Amino acid sequence: MSNDKGLEEIPEDQSTTPHKPTSNVGSRLTRLFQSTGQIETNYDEITDSFDAMELKPELLRGVYAYGFERPSAIQQRAIKPIIKGSDVIAQAQSGTGKTATFSISALQKLDPNVKGCQALILAPTRELAQQIQKVVVAIGDFMNITCHACIGGTAVREDMKALGEGPEVVVGTPGRVHDMIQRRVLKTDHLKQFILDEADEMLSRGFTEQIYDIFQLLPQSTQVVLLSATMPQDVLEVTTKFMRDPVRILVKKQELTLEGIKQFYIAVEKEEWKLDTLSDLYETVTITQAVIFCNTRRKVDWLTDKLTARDFTVSAMHGDMEQSQRDVIMKEFRSGSSRVLIATDLLARGIDVQQVSLVINYDLPANRENYIHRIGRGGRFGRKGVAINFVTADDVRMMREIEQFYSTQIEEMPMNVADLI
């Protein structure tokens, strides 16, 4: 959190004085952004494994239990500076792993001896706030912490009761959070971190005044972390007014991952016919290594059982499994002793296998951002790959959305697909 001099450390005895906005220390940043549309990264350090982040053992256990294998690009860059206490601006799209980035960082910085809100997370919508709460609770599963979602549309009395119990992490929407701080129900005396997720969305929804008011009610020493897909003028103003010498991290969208990957679809009239379609595909092509994605853990288990019953050798992996079990499966898959892996989206980003020649979306992903994480497996390291999507009548709209979003074309699978893999 910034003081008038912008870059100086704040003396301890000022830690409870409310925030005063700075002068426009970021005019150079603003000019640079206006010419490029992107912030300029000023931090290059990369930590490429969760083990190397020096996380608390119970937090590390939660990270692996949640299903993460290795950190995504933003997690490799942003977790360490946030943990060290720097103000951080991260420009990143959804689907890059940013929720886990600030959740892990916030959990690491919690003091177990202090009861009360130490991390406050703002989100533009109730749904996103609830989603973030679930991630924080899941990753913090072994840490004995509580996380409360403070959102509009719920009973104020219940909110007040939950906040009175002193949850260590509070995630909410600007209106309700501001109301609770003003009522002194949400106490900020112990607050260490203020995290704004999807800042561009929040400001475009007209929350600017409430966000500025919240800043005024926080201790001067509060660390500020801001995440935004775009950096319009109103977001830049927040960064220049309220942040002190921030670390700036730009994570570009992974556009290159679709290059060199042939994308096809097979029209499947009914959901029940997908299994036979997959069996036929097995007969047609010689698979070096393939990953098959389903949308639920239950579907992964069901498909594994069905294929095993038909004498196909497959491995399955999802977040319900113990980490040790998942490690064994990944080791077998990487070494090539297991050739077909059936998995959920949760693990899409952790599967880094060079030999994967084929990705099959048994289910199209529920959101278009996950498409690139699934398909990206096939074309990593400059290798060619093939992606085949099973598409029912209900999926056509999502497939068109994916094509539009990535400016790509998914064509009907040709008869000679075996020659392409």
Swiss-Prot record:
Region Disordered, residue ranges: 1-26
Principal location listed in the UniProt entry: cytoplasm
Localization: Cytoplasm
Example GO biological process: cytoplasmic translational initiation
Binding residues for ATP: A92, Q93, S94, G95, T96, G97, K98, T99
EC assignment: 3.6.4.13
Composition skew (Polar residues), residue ranges: 13-26
Pfam families for the chain: DEAD, Helicase_C
Motif (Q motif): 48-76
Domain Helicase C-terminal: 260-421
One GO molecular-function entry: RNA helicase activity
GO cellular component, one term: cytoplasm
Keyword list, A-Z: ATP-binding, Cytoplasm, Helicase, Hydrolase, Initiation factor, Nucleotide-binding, Protein biosynthesis, RNA-binding
Enzyme class: hydrolase
Subunit structure of this chain's protein: Component of the eIF4F complex, which composition varies with external and internal environmental conditions. It is composed of at least eIF4A, eIF4E and eIF4G.
Primary role: ATP-dependent RNA helicase which is a subunit of the eIF4F complex involved in cap recognition and is required for mRNA binding to ribosome. In the current model of translation initiation, eIF4A unwinds RNA secondary structures in the 5'-UTR of mRNAs which is necessary to allow efficient binding of the small ribosomal subunit, and subsequent scanning for the initiator codon.
Family: Belongs to the DEAD box helicase family. eIF4A subfamily.
Comment, domains: The Q motif is unique to and characteristic of the DEAD box family of RNA helicases and controls ATP binding and hydrolysis.
Name of the protein in its database record: ATP-dependent RNA helicase eIF4A
Species the sequence originates in: Aspergillus oryzae (strain ATCC 42149 / RIB 40)
